[in-house]
């Protein structure tokens, strides 16, 4: 089940560049001078991360990356 595995985090572009190296990013939406980033993660990835309902794309990315990590 994907509930509790998708998070919204607001961050700068510079933070996103570093963040995407270690996390599964499913979507990025510009909001002013920051980015609203959807992160797929088993654990809360940041103190200010907000849990959000998963989409089909989130589930696909989670499963694809899970298979890749265990290959």
Task: Identify the residue ranges that each predicted region occupies.
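ABC transporter nucleotide-binding domain
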Residues: 1-39
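C-terminal coupling/interaction segments
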Residues: 31-71
């Amino acid at each position: 089940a994907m509930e509790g595995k998708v998070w919204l985090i607001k961050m700068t572009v510079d933070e996103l560049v570093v963040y995407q190296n270690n996390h599964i990013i499913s979507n990025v939406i510009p909001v002013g001078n920051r980015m609203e980033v959807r992160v797929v993660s088993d654990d809360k990835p940041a103190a200010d991360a907000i849990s959000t309902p998963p989409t089909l794309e989130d589930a696909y990315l989670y499963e694809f990356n899970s298979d890749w990590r265990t290959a």
